[in-house]
Swiss-Prot record:
Cystine crosslinks: none
InterPro entries listed in its UniProt record: UPF0250_YbeD-like (IPR007454), YbeD-like_sf (IPR027471)
Residue stretches spanning the membrane: none
Protein name, UniProt field: UPF0250 protein NGO_0791
Family: Belongs to the UPF0250 family.
HAMAP family attached to this UniProt entry: UPF0250 (MF_00659)
Length: 91
């Protein structure tokens, strides 16, 4: 890790990062999230994602455990997920 990366990131890379994704109640939500993450982290498998409905059932929440190598990769995953039509929020 370069000195510049140390100054701009509190995350130590490489690491397994838990992405929290909220989105539409849709039968393809889980698969869409997984496929989007795999564009930037191809080693992500189906067992790395868990989903659950929101308390009122209006949304679906997903947590994806993603192995990321650097901040750029993580940023690319965030951008890809937030631009997906089924995704509302990514944390």
């Amino acid at each position: 890790m370069t000195e510049q990366e140390n100054k701009t990131s509190l995350i130590e890379f490489p690491c397994t990062f838990p992405l929290k994704v909220m989105g539409a109640v849709h039968p393809e939500f889980e698969q869409a999230v997984l496929e989007t993450v795999r564009l930037h982290a191809p080693d992500t498998q189906a067992h790395h994602i868990t989903t659950r409905p929101s308390s009122k059932g209006n949304y679906t929440g997903a947590t994806v455990q993603v192995k990321v190598e650097n901040q750029e990769q993580l940023d690319n995953i965030y951008r890809a997920l937030t631009s997906h039509e089924l995704v509302k929020v990514v944390l």
